[in-house]
Amino acid sequence: MAVPKQKRSRSRTHHKRAKIYRAISVPLEKCPNCGEYKMPHRVCLHCGYYKGKQVLEISE
């Protein structure tokens, strides 16, 4: 069975764990219909359009 040769220091452990919880920047693009920012390849939550077609009924 494999055994580590040396103990991993606390700072190395914390540095490795910190990468897991790092905030991920989300790419945003403007909706061609209303101009609001939305996530790519998803329905616009402001107007309900996706690829030029009405998909969701948005009540205002």
Curated annotation (Swiss-Prot):
| Cellular component terms per the entry's GO annotation | cytosolic large ribosomal subunit
Q: Which GO terms describe its biological process?
A: translation
Superkingdom is Bacteria
Q: Does the keyword Ribosomal protein apply?
A: yes
Give UniProt keywords alphabetically: Ribonucleoprotein, Ribosomal protein
Give GO terms: molecular function aspect only: structural constituent of ribosome
HAMAP family registered for this protein in UniProt: Ribosomal_bL32
Assigned protein family: Belongs to the bacterial ribosomal protein bL32 family.
The record's section on PANTHER family has: 50S RIBOSOMAL PROTEIN L32, LARGE RIBOSOMAL SUBUNIT PROTEIN BL32
What name has this protein been given in UniProt? Large ribosomal subunit protein bL32
Organism for this UniProt entry: Thermotoga maritima (strain ATCC 43589 / DSM 3109 / JCM 10099 / NBRC 100826 / MSB8)
Q: Which gene encodes it?
A: rpmF
